[in-house]
Design a protein with these regions (language model features):
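Catalytic Walker B motif of ABC-type/P-loop ATPase nucleotide-binding domains
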Residues: 168-171
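Conserved ABC ATPase "signature" region
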Residues: 70-72, 120-139
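A short, proline-enriched helix->beta-strand linker immediately N-terminal to the Walker B motif
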Residues: 162-166
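Helix-to-loop junction immediately C-terminal to a conserved catalytic motif
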Residues: 54
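ABC ATPase NBD coupling module
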Residues: 71-90, 120
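Helix N-cap at the start of a conserved alpha-helix in ABC-type nucleotide-binding domains
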Residues: 179-181
């Protein structure tokens, strides 16, 4: 992979909590358009790896570069670095984590207005376009509790895309979906990758990974123990 093609670079990352090592000597390069599936049992380090990339979990050694943001192990990220990271990375949590007191559209607009300082009308226009792209524009004014699992997930994806991140992190996005919805999600991931985004997706579903990811990493006890190609 050419240096200029990388949008994500992880070098020798180690992360521990107390005596427990959660990530050990993790290395990864990712390019625009990559769909990378992270396979592994519960507790293997998949979610921790995503959280470290997003700046949510501090790591002790190594470095992570995402777009123009760079984090060093053992050092607190500066405010400017965190701002660059926020604009480079979108995160879709396993449980969609939508704010229950905000409508679907308001959830999507929140970061655009308060972090990116976009005017409200521009944020709403952008939010509606994202909802339309994801097939849930009719649910823009719905409260999260009124959304189905698949609808809530698509709203969460729209929220993660609202800041136009270069890297999209998705933690177990298939967990609450039936087989047909999983296939729809896989096609959505491929469309997003086709638009030049880099996606990292944690999953227990090896068949999904083989069908929709172009790269597969297997993580066990914090180590990347296998790398293979998917679709």
């Amino acid at each position: 992979m050419a240096l200029g093609a990388r949008v994500l670079s992880i070098r020798d990352v180690e992360l521990a909590r107390g005596e427990r090592v959660l990530l050990s000597q993790v290395n990864l390069d990712a390019a625009p358009g990559d769909v990378i599936a992270l396979l592994g049992p519960s507790g293997s380090g998949k979610t921790t790896m995503l959280r470290a990339i997003a700046g949510l979990d501090a790591f002790q050694r190594g470095s992570i570069e995402v777009g123009e943001a760079r984090m060093e192990g053992g050092a607190a990220a500066s405010r400017d670095e965190l701002r660059r990271l926020t604009r480079s990375v979108g995160f879709v949590f396993q449980f969609h984590c939508l704010f229950e007191h905000l409508s679907a559209l308001q959830n999507i607009c929140l970061a655009q207005v308060h972090v990116a300082r976009r005017p409200q009308h521009e944020a709403e226009q952008s939010g509606r376009e994202l909802l339309r792209e994801l097939g849930v524009e009719a649910r823009a004014d719905a409260w999260p509790r009124a959304l189905s699992g698949g609808e809530a997930q698509r709203v969460a994806i729209a929220r993660a895309l609202a800041m136009n991140p270069r890297v999209l992190l998705m933690d177990e996005p298939m967990a609450s979906l039936d087989q047909s919805r999983r296939a729809e999600l896989g096609k959505l991931l491929q469309r997003l990758a086709g638009a030049g985004r880099t996606l990292l997706v944690t999953t227990h579903d090896e068949s999904f990974a083989n069908q929709f990811a172009n790269r597969i990493l297997t993580i066990r006890d914090g180590h990347v123990v296998e790398a293979s190609s998917g679709s």
